[in-house]
């Protein structure tokens, strides 16, 4: 099914890392440009390289109901990359194990199927004890904003989350694949878009305000 709804809730809890209780208590970086991430080859990349650009940072998966979002993001990237928009893609396997491949396999899939040309980085965790420091910091800047109640997948997502953790709405945890953080040219996290947010109708206008 679209979101592998038949998966066991315990499996979901195990791989999602619902609670942030075990995450690093303090993320000392005060700017997004203080962070270093790993590219697909495991090499360090300083986010200071992206100073002055508008960024979308997104956790992704290749076997998810939201995977076609890649096409929407690529369309947005082609439209605005010459205006200094960058989309930084971080595959994550925490949500139902829907990003099972290696970084190179994921890249090959995305370029072949969706023509992706924006930067893709190494796989990360975004919740729990092993959460990447960048995503710990992003969640502290912008918490959960709620799903689009009109989206057809929202009832499925809320059902899964309710079973996994009745208090999921109260935490800043990333809830699913394709959660997007919008960063302005000064490095401020200005918006968080849940996976149900339409890229063309909701994300693109917010991006264009910053370009």
Q: Where are the regions a protein language model picked out?
A:
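Thiol-based oxidoreductase modules, predominantly thioredoxin-like and allied folds used
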Residues: 84-101, 117-128
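Non-catalytic, surface beta->alpha helical segment in thiol-disulfide oxidoreductase systems
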Residues: 191-211
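Thiol/selenol-based redox catalytic cores and closely related redox-interacting motifs
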Residues: 109-197
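N-terminal "domain-start" segment that seeds a small globular fold
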Residues: 15, 24-48
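Short loop/turn microsegments at loop-to-beta-strand junctions
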Residues: 32-33, 55, 177-179
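Conserved helix-turn-beta segment immediately C-terminal to the redox Cys motif
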Residues: 53-54, 62-63, 67-90, 111-114
